[in-house]
Amino acid sequence: MKNKVTTIFLSDLNPFSKSIEEWASNKALTIERIESKSQDIDELVDGVVVFHENHNISKEIEELQGLLDNSNRPGHRIDINGTLAATKSNFEMWLERNKPSKLLFLGSDELPKNENLERFLSNLM
């Protein structure tokens, strides 16, 4: 994420959020926690990134992404079981096009059990 992302927002305290915090701990990123039902979430973030496995996305995450989409906040979905090179390239193009500095990362509690999450995160920077 060489594209000036400075802050990652994480909703709730769950295994996915903990994985992202661990990954970001040695990066030049600020981690902020917000409640997923926060009324002003669209004022806090510039975009949302939804991590998923094979398009398995919870209703709550779908609704939150929809709320941000209605507020003209760009969203990107990352299938951690997809091809790493293509997924990384698409994400980098999305970052370049939208130029977000504050992103909300969302993912299910089950994602950290998939070794592809760590593999993808380690290739982000």
Residue ranges and their predicted role:
Residues 2-102, 107-109, 113-121:
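Acidic/glycine-enriched connector segments
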